[in-house]
């Protein structure tokens, strides 16, 4: 009964209730992807690995699932590894985030901390949608130079004179 209840809840969430008795070859590509996601969510596992689970879903369903998946994960006593290239997905899921570069973790921490205080340019770029505006600046006293433009800027930032790269999110 517990399994039937979980299947029903996940099937409803993923809009699969009408397809529960269909064979795999009778399902569209999107329905097959949702079915694979449903199988992962129904199982009582200690670890769930999800690789781009929302990638090929239509916009409306993807937006609904961005809201609902975190709620499903909260009810589970398991570890969820959610691989995504979508910053919004990572922010919605929350928890901890690892930024990877060529298979190596270059930043790890609470998702909002990684977003708000990226430790490197790669983490900053990965977590920006739309893309972050990147500029090289130099600081001398209270003068900041961006390209050939001098800007006098009083700041509470305690940074040394020198060259920097700044990122501005739109």
Predicted feature locations:
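Short aromatic-centered micro-motifs
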Residues: 99, 144-145
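Beta-strand-connecting loop/turn residues
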Residues: 103, 140-143
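A sequence-level detector of short linear motifs
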Residues: 107, 141, 152-154
């Amino acid at each position: 009964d517990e399994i039937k209840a979980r299947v029903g809840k996940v099937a409803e969430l993923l809009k699969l209730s009408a397809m529960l008795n269909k064979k795999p070859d009778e399902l569209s590509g999107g329905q097959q992807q949702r079915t694979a996601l449903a199988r992962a969510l129904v199982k009582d596992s200690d670890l769930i690995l999800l690789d781009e689970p929302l990638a090929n879903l239509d916009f409306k369903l993807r937006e609904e699932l961005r809201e609902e998946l975190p709620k499903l994960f909260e009810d589970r006593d398991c570890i969820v590894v959610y691989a995504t290239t979508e910053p919004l997905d990572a922010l919605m899921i929350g928890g901890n985030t690892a930024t990877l570069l060529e298979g190596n973790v270059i930043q790890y921490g609470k998702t909002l901390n990684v977003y708000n205080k990226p430790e490197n340019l790669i983490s900053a770029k990965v977590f920006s949608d739309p893309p972050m505006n990147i500029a090289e600046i130099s600081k001398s006293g209270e003068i900041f130079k961006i390209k050939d433009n001098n800007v006098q800027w009083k700041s509470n930032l305690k940074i040394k004179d020198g060259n920097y790269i700044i990122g501005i999110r739109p």
